[in-house]
Amino acid sequence: MRDPVETYMNLVPMVVEQTNRGERAYDIFSRLLKERIIFLTGPVEDGMSTLVVAQLLFLEAENPKKEISMYINSPGGVVTSGLAIYDTMQFIRPPVSTLCTGQAASMGSLLLAAGHKDMRFSLPNARIMVHQPSGGFQGQATDIMLHAQEILNLKKRLNEIYVHHTGQTYKAIEDALERDKFLTAEMAREFGIVDKVIDKRAEETASASGPKAP
């Protein structure tokens, strides 16, 4: 059976760039990384989180002041993996702009909201979903109680992060996240998860360097 990672890598387009030393080939994502664009795509888990964190740190080392653009299309995933990305976004010096393409659900929506103020965007047909954390555990009764308490602690912390980035009250966030809450791009703007819904890049800012405001 073929390795799915190998199959995927074989499908990634290569681009050729002319340099003073001749031609140089890059896979498309590496070429866009040169333009300080990071893709956060698919389920959030430890492997993906490590790659995103590494790219953020690399781009900070290259230029600690220049904006980093993060394109998000994710159904969410592991809370701790998402928080590793979130903490790194807040830790590094360059401002990180976020743009939702497709969907930003669960931890994806939190990372979308975590972009630099006035630099959080969504395309018009993207969908955003917020909810409280979920989990399961089996074992001794005492261990189950400990894990249940940890989920409650995580719920409280995630609510506080949403409060910080959306400007909503804690009660409003708690009510919104009680069940799966699906938002259109415009609803996400009104809720405070994004700052602007964009459908075109403005002519004066049209470049490969990321989703700057029109």
From Swiss-Prot:
BP GO annotations: protein quality control for misfolded or incompletely synthesized proteins
Purpose: Cleaves peptides in various proteins in a process that requires ATP hydrolysis. Has a chymotrypsin-like activity. Plays a major role in the degradation of misfolded proteins.
Active site: 106 (nucleophile), 131
Gene: clpP
Coiled coil: none
The protein's name in its UniProt record: ATP-dependent Clp protease proteolytic subunit
Recorded family membership: Belongs to the peptidase S14 family.
Superkingdom classification of source: Bacteria
Keywords linked to the UniProt accession: Cytoplasm, Hydrolase, Protease, Serine protease
